[in-house]
Amino acid sequence: MLHMDLFGPIAYISIGGNKYGLVIVDDYSRFTWVFFLHDKSETQGVLKKFLRRAQNEFNLRIKKIRSDNGSEFKNTQVEEYLDEEDIKHEFSAPYTPQQNGVAERKNRTLIEMTKSMFDEYKTSDRFWAEAVNTTCHASNSLYLHHLLKKTPYELLTGNKPNVSYFCVFGSKCFVLNKKPKSSKFAPKVYEGFLLGYDSNSRVYRVFNKDSGCVETTCDAMFDETNGSQVEQFDLDIVDN
């Protein structure tokens, strides 16, 4: 069974232009996925794509999902798709969020972890989605299931997680520039800082200080000696 809940709208639009987060939790392993949305109306499309991926990539036989009664979950398009896939849809009773407690608790945990990260590193609110994604990625590989004493990652995949590539959120990095060179004098590396990891993999998400964009790379060297660079960076380039 999968538990799911939508949070938002967040007061600050993320640097990716998102205001909502869709959290999905596997009942057995407590492995968690989080997706970021511009608008609530995107929920059904993201949900359909995820359910197909989960059944193919993780070999999950999804029999049931549980959500609240929000219109993003309770609508004709979603119900027709679930009927086609033979997936049962349970709803929590109105005004009783405890009936969707697994997803609600995970939401609170991710948000509280993100707030702590923001307080520690004085992070711009525009990076909230990147921070939530990072806390979700870390929790899947670091926290033990209270009964089974294994991480969600191991329970889902059967493999122990490799956390050797984890770095301090916001740490300075130097990234190999593999883009086509506009001139012979184009820099071979660019400076940025770490914002997290991509799709539960070892691909880094970094903020390119020159372009003001979030980019993904496997070719980065990190300097964690000076802590987070997020609080030291002039965010005018992000906000403009």
Go through the PLM ranges and name each one:
Residues 1-36, 40, 180-181:
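An active-site-proximal beta-strand-loop segment
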Residues 16-32, 51, 81, 109-110, ...:
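Short conserved beta-strand segments at catalytic cores or DNA/RNA-binding microdomains
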Residues 19, 67-69, 73-79, 89-113, ...:
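RNase H-like two-metal-ion nuclease catalytic core shared by retroviral integrases
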Residues 30, 50, 68, 139, ...:
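Residue-level signal for inorganic ion chemistry
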Residues 35-58, 212, 220-221:
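Active-site beta-loop-alpha junctions of metal-dependent nucleic acid enzymes
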Residues 63, 147, 153-157, 164-169, ...:
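Retroelement integrase C-terminal DNA-binding domain
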Residues 105-147, 191-194, 198-199:
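Charged alpha-helix within mobile-element recombinases
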Residues 116-128, 153-158, 176-186:
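Short, solvent-exposed helix-loop connector elements
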